[in-house]
Regions:
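Soluble metallo-hydrolase cores and metallopeptidase-like ectodomains found primarily
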Residues: 24-29, 109-110, 121-156, 219-315, ...
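His/Asp/Glu-rich mid-to-C-terminal helical/loop segments that flank catalytic regions of hydrolases
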Residues: 331, 335, 451-490
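Noncatalytic luminal/extracellular "stalk/propeptide" segments of secretory-pathway proteins
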Residues: 51-173
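Bacterial Sec-dependent N-terminal signal peptides
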Residues: 1-24
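Catalytic-core environment of secreted peptidases
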Residues: 35-53, 58-81, 107, 156-158, ...
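Extracytoplasmic/secreted proteins, especially bacterial periplasmic and envelope-associated proteins
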Residues: 28-31, 36, 40-43, 47, ...
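Second-shell loop/turn segments in exported
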Residues: 27-35, 51-61, 126-128, 149-151, ...
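Metal-dependent peptidase/peptidase-like ectodomains
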Residues: 115-116, 155, 222-225, 230-241, ...
Length: 490
């Protein structure tokens, strides 16, 4: 009888203290959860969007300084250097420094001069050669020469010494196996090289967005022009730009020379640095479980932006916002009393805007084996909206449920998800390279924009961010990733 009483007493004590431990862990979780602050996360975004970093063009001294600032934050919080004692993973990254907006002058058929203005009418080319070119214009559609596909935009036109006007993309747009054949011709680099191969002296690239994902070619000057400029140039030549562009979808080239009395003159003031390097910033929270700590969860987002093109492109939403959210989550994990069983790798990619340089380098030179990578979560433009969208969430329900439960219990935001869909075109995000490597990959986005989205524009400033959704994004990362990290059933 005495033994039975003692057993029951010990059972009561054990269950009582188990309850206290559970409550303590809950308190610890809430303490960390509430420590994540919209004010601090906005401060991170404001710092990275500051003029002193000149838009964080990958490879530039200003980008490297922004990377060092992020690394210092990791160090201050106790996030470990992930690359053999270093917070940096370096890779080659040529870049072009743009010193001014340059100029863009149009001389009409009746000799009237129209001086187009930056940033209303054009952006200078991020990789333009320095100098001035002047000449007649030839429209070459997509600028593609693909004999095996029976398609050539340069057939029956002479562009030698002239300024070509061309479009991004390809005439084939369906996401199926046929698109694979067209994908090599979708790259901006290909289009530029093909223009030079055909003798073009310069380029008007239709679509006024900043774009470092091009190529620097000696003596080749180019600008990005607004569609309204293209419309004016076509109208003065007796054509309607919108109708010509629409006809491109018929899979037939529509190239033609504009009136030879129409002359454009474009100039750029730049310097190219072919041997520059950039870096990913890599920080680590080590897992504590002896069997699971060799497995890793990656949280990534690109640190680089569009740089300086006559004025600073702050690149606040794209992607200081995503980096700020990641920093908020990293600080929370570093200071949390609840530790993860699996390791967590925080990655701030360089070179995304230049062509996914940093993420490609990591996938080819991983710090953790690919087969030990449980999931990769990418953040890009996560700072303007009232809800969340998780790409690929429905395809990995055992992983995604940790984020769903966190949102339902603590955040109560509208959150939607999609199935993973094979992309037959060129990869467009850091996440796509991890996905192609066979890693379960999510992309976290904000939805229901509160402010206009100034994609690759100088107006992409911190005044168009919604700090409340950024705070909740960091909280969602903390809770969801902690759930994945401590799920022994995965």
């Amino acid at each position: 009888m005495l033994f039975k009483k003692n057993f029951l007493f010990l059972l009561f004590i054990a269950s009582h203290f188990a309850g206290l431990t559970q409550k303590t862990n809950s308190d610890k979780l809430l303490t960390t959860f509430h420590s994540i602050s919209s004010h601090e996360i906005l401060e991170f975004a404001e710092e990275l969007s500051a003029d002193k970093y000149k838009g964080r063009l990958s490879g530039s001294p200003e980008y490297l300084e922004a990377a060092r600032w992020c690394a210092r934050k990791f160090e201050d919080w106790g996030v470990l250097p992930a690359n053999n004692g270093s917070y940096f993973q370096n890779f080659p990254n040529a870049f072009t420094e743009v010193y001014s907006a340059g100029s863009f002058l149009y001389t009409t058929t009746d000799k009237k001069e129209i001086k187009y203005t930056f940033p209303e009418d054009y952006f200078p080319g991020s990789n333009s050669a320095s100098g001035t070119v002047s000449g007649e214009m030839v429209y070459v559609g997509y600028g593609i020469t693909a004999p095996e596909l029976g398609y050539d935009d340069y057939e029956n036109v002479n562009v030698e010494g002239k300024i070509v006007i061309l479009e991004s993309g390809t005439p084939y747009t369906k996401n199926d196996t046929t698109l694979v054949k067209w994908t090599p011709y979708a790259y901006h680099r290909y289009k530029f090289r093909n223009a030079v191969k055909h003798g073009a002296a310069g380029l008007l690239y239709v679509g006024k967005i900043a774009n470092p994902n091009t190529v620097h070619l000696e003596n080749f000057v180019y600008v990005h022009i607004d569609e309204k400029v293209a419309e004016q140039l076509f109208t003065d030549s007796g054509e309607k730009y919108s109708e010509v562009k629409k006809s491109l979808g018929e899979m037939k080239p529509v190239s033609f020379a504009l009136n030879p009395n129409q002359i454009v003159t474009i100039s750029a003031e730049t310097r190219h640095f072919p041997d520059a390097e950039s870096c990913n910033v890599v920080g680590l929270i080590e897992g504590y479980d002896p069997e699971l700590k060799d497995e890793v969860i990656i949280i990534g987002g690109h640190l680089d932006g569009q740089g300086f093109l006559g004025e600073v492109f702050p690149s606040a939403l794209d992607n200081a916002s995503g980096v700020a959210d990641i920093l908020g989550a990293a600080k929370a994990f570093a200071q949390s009393e609840i530790k993860p069983k699996r390791s967590i790798l925080f990655m701030l990619f360089g070179g995304e805007e230049c062509g996914l340089y940093g993420s490609r380098y990591y996938v080819e030179n991983p710090l953790f084996p690919i087969e030990k990578t449980v999931t990769m979560i990418n953040l890009d433009m996560v700072g303007n909206g009232t809800g969340f969208f998780v790409s690929n969430g429905k395809s990995y329900p055992k992983l995604f449920e940790h984020f769903e439960k966190a949102n339902e219990k603590f955040l109560h935001r509208e959150m939607a998800a999609s199935e993973q869909r094979k992309n037959y075109g060129r990869p467009r995000s850091d996440a796509s390279l991890f996905e192609n490597a066979g890693i379960p990959t999510f992309s976290l986005w904000t939805r229901n924009s509160v402010f206009p989205v100034y994609y690759h524009q100088p107006l992409d400033k911190t005044n168009v961010l919604t700090p409340e959704i950024m705070e909740d994004a960091a909280k969602l990362l903390y809770l969801g990733i902690l759930g994945v990290a401590n799920d022994s059933g995965l």
